[in-house]
């Protein structure tokens, strides 16, 4: 039995209460989705084509964190690969170098889903976020903190804001699909559409030259391997307090504070987020902004 769905629901409830207390004191379609389905034969294994053609990912970071150099470049490539591979439930949409940089999903709490669930995984339905209909809009990621050094490794905390994305319905309208964790449609609380990840990285040894700088451009995805020998060791989306017998690297109190930070730093106020995640909308309500900082186009 995969504990992720149970713990996600339990810890989400606990952390939401913790966030409320902190405030007072201081991105899967549901199983059985009936939207229009694209044939797998019509989707080429190319990022940001087909079902993801009208979605883009935009990044921001706290002051002092350079999104254009490692290790932030590695974090960007990892998270974007995770999002695309998870939405399409296929490893064919990972960026070049992902397979070598990211270990397979394991059996420990810290690595149960270091990779997204894909077709063939037993828990794709209850823990994945595959879309079978076009997804549109702007998915935002934000590096909240980045600590460490090349010798001991780095730890990043990343906010994921997917509330401004939506999937197409049979009637041509769009709605937010309430993924991660699965929620009843039209759920709208302060954390709906907001995720949090704690990612551990290891630099290559011996050090390799960084990818050609700067890692910015007009392309939504890289055409070459930008992982540069870096390894993604762990990627947690829940407090580690639940994993008995494993290091408690992300205690519940710290996890709740980080969730509050991701909530308060979201680009849109709660009322705007509530608008995005409830009801049916026209396509224009979910604008597709250009990728930022993007990646160098092929041949540049």
Placement of each model-derived feature along the sequence:
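Bacterial N-terminal signal peptides that target proteins for export
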Residues: 2-17
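C-terminal motif of bacterial Sec signal peptides marking the signal peptidase cleavage site
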Residues: 23-26
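Bacterial signal peptide processing site
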Residues: 28-31
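Core segments of small alpha/beta cavity-forming domains
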Residues: 38-134
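Structured, amphipathic secondary-structure segments that form assembly/contact surfaces
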Residues: 91-194, 202-204, 209-213
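Low-complexity, intrinsically disordered terminal/linker segments enriched in charged
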Residues: 188-300
């Amino acid at each position: 039995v995969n504990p992720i769905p149970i713990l996600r629901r339990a810890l989400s409830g606990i952390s939401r209460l913790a966030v409320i207390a902190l405030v007072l004191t201081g991105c899967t379609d549901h199983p059985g989705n009936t939207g229009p389905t694209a044939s797998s034969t019509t989707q080429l294994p190319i990022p940001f084509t087909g079902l993801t053609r009208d979605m883009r990912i935009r990044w921001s970071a706290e002051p002092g964190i350079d999104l254009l150099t490692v290790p932030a470049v590695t974090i960007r490539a990892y998270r974007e690969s995770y999002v695309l591979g998870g939405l399409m439930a296929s490893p064919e949409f990972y960026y070049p170098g992902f397979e070598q940089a990211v270990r397979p999903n394991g059996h420990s709490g810290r690595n149960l889903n270091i990779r997204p669930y894909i077709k063939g995984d037993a828990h794709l339905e209850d823990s994945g976020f595959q879309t079978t209909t076009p997804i549109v809009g702007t998915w935002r990621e934000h590096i909240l903190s980045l600590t460490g050094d090349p010798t001991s490794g780095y730890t990043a905390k990343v906010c994921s804001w997917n509330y401004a994305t939506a999937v197409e319905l049979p009637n041509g309208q769009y709605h937010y699909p309430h993924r991660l964790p699965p929620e009843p449609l039209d759920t709208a609380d302060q954390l709906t559409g907001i995720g949090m990840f704690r990612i551990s990285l290891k630099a290559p040894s011996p050090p390799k030259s960084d990818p050609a700088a700067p890692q910015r451009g007009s392309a939504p995805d890289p055409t070459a391997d930008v992982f540069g020998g870096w390894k993604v060791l762990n990627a947690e989306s829940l407090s580690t307090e639940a994993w008995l017998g494993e290091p408690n690297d992300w205690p519940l109190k710290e996890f709740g504070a980080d969730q509050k930070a991701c909530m308060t730093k979201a680009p849109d106020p709660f009322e705007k987020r509530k608008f995005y995640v409830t009801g049916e909308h026209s396509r224009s309500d979910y604008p597709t902004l250009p990728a930022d900082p993007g990646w160098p186009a092929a041949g540049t």
